[in-house]
Amino acid sequence: SRGLGDVYKRQIINGLVLDLHAVKQRDPAASGYLPTLLFSKGFLALQTHRASNYFLNSKESLMASFLHSQSSKLYGVDIHPAASIGVGVMLDHATGIVIGETSVIEDDVSIFQGVTLGGTGKVTGDRHPKVRQGVLISAGAKILGNVEIGQGAKVAAGSVVLDNVEMNTTVAGVPAVAVGKPSSDSPAITVDHTIEE
């Protein structure tokens, strides 16, 4: 219906504004809003996902698949159109990020290059990670299966997460284990990749 389309469009615009602010606030290399809007591939891939998700929810799956395919080719970022992504999200550097179909990413999350939110095999249904608010996922981390990354958690670079991560916990390693607590309640905002003990 037309009313539903208007709601989705407002959500897309709200997401764009808050994502743009997130990049400007968290990325020291972001020189301003306009360059981010025009050239940041993580930001652009995320906005393309928002459009493809809109088309998927509007029963226009062919257009959703087309946008997904083109975004993957152009930006090197693979976000399934059905993935649920909140606002104020930053995909930094972005190359090689993969976000599976049933993934859920809440508001104010920061994800770095080479991160995978994937399944563990041929299981169907709800099979991808759930990333709660304020989470920081560092470069190259792999989070596999229907696991929950608790609010304010931090996943260290190169980690392989196969189990739930408690809120406000830092995990590292292969397989990942708890190694400490983040220095803030929202590591996605402070973007501190160090491991505290």
Regions found by a protein language model. Name each.
Residues 184-195:
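Short, charged, intrinsically disordered terminal tails
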Residues 17, 31-38, 43-97:
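Extended, small-residue-rich solenoid/repeat segments and analogous flexible loops
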Residues 10-14:
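Non-catalytic extracellular/periplasmic "stalk"
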